[in-house]
A protein has these predicted regions:
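Hydrophobic alpha-helical transmembrane segments
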Residues: 1-172, 177, 185-319
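Solvent-exposed interhelical
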Residues: 182
């Protein structure tokens, strides 16, 4: 991918986002996962069989997605190069989620600012997996900030990283990995073994992007507040490993330090409380103004990640 193509994809995502009425590769990937799970589960029972079948589904969807997209772009370019480039731009934009992430989080903030707590809970439920029906204002604020931090990596920096590294096919492979993890990478009775390969692959795919994202959060904070870089850096390096996720802990701890707020605590999933470690334990809990600041940090980190990708692509092109 060239820097100009990446720029067009990034701007298209900023302008349009991902309207629900538009076709989207991730929806097709989700359909493939659902369609493949049923027959594969009939192939055997027990932990070993479930793991093998889940690994087969994971590898088939990830490699198949990348191959189909690669052949599609090549085929269109062979017949009409400008149209092929346009398809590459659109597919690249579909891998990114800056506009959607900021819009969804902003909708929750607006509901909080106008004291529509129930509306804020409903909007929040669109972007988090935890139970939202009984959350108070501060708990909603924390949930939004944690989602912004984690989704900065999953929805923006990681796709940019893979677009820069291997173009649209590799970024689509990443989105397939991420989709598989969200659909079957759960630690419950149904998916503990069937989804283990997907969960491990997603962890591996996010090792570098999550740490780049955490560093970009530090850099973004430095542009907004004096001393924020050091605070974000120290909190990140100290607290990242406390988190159960090897990757979410990177961005959430960095964001906690960048904002000077405490993240983590008790979350409820399917009516079951789950205690998560405190990140930035010395700070106060977040409020609505902290979420506004988190939105700015996320937006600036996104732009910084895009600029970094363009620099790398230009360097490779001129080398």
């Amino acid at each position: 991918m060239r820097a100009g193509t990446l720029t067009a994809s990034y701007l298209l995502d900023w302008i349009l986002g991902d309207p629900e009425s538009y076709p989207h590769p991730v929806r097709l990937i989700g359909w493939a996962v659902e369609s493949g799970e049923r027959p594969l589960r009939r192939m055997g029972e027990g932990r070993k069989a479930e793991f093998i079948c889940g690994a087969l589904l994971t590898s088939s969807v990830v490699l198949g997605s990348a191959l189909v997209i690669s052949k599609l772009i090549q085929s269109i370019k062979a017949h009409h190069r400008p149209l092929g480039t346009a398809a590459e731009v659109w597919l690249g934009a579909s891998c990114l989620a800056t506009r959607n992430l900021l819009d969804e989080a902003n909708a929750v903030v607006k509901a909080l600012e106008t004291s529509h707590l129930e509306s804020a809970r409903l909007r929040l439920a669109r972007i988090v997996g935890r139970d939202t029906a009984a959350l108070n204002e501060n708990e909603i604020a924390r949930a939004v900030i944690e989602t912004l931090a984690e989704s900065l990596c999953d929805g923006i920096i990681a796709p940019l990283f893979y677009l820069t590294l291997g173009g649209v096919p590799l970024s689509i492979a990443y989105k397939a990995t991420n989709t598989l993890d969200s659909m079957i990478g759960h630690k419950d009775e149904r998916y503990e073994w069937f989804g283990k390969a997907a969960a491990r692959l997603d962890d591996a795919a996010n090792v570098l992007p999550s740490r780049i994202s955490a560093l970009l959060i530090c850099g973004s904070a430095a542009l907004m507040e004096r001393g924020a870089f050091q605070r974000a850096w120290m909190t990140w390096r100290r607290d990242a490993r406390k988190h159960a996720s090897p990757n979410a802990g990177q961005t959430e701890s960095s964001m906690a330090g960048a904002l000077g707020v405490q993240l983590g605590g008790i979350n409820t999933y399917n009516s079951e409380p789950v205690e998560t470690p405190l990140l930035g334990a010395e700070f106060e809990g977040p409020n609505v103004s902290a979420v506004r600041k988190a939105l700015r940090v996320t937006a600036v980190a996104s732009v910084m990640g895009f600029a970094l990708g363009c620099l790398v692509l230009n360097w490779r092109q001129n080398d």
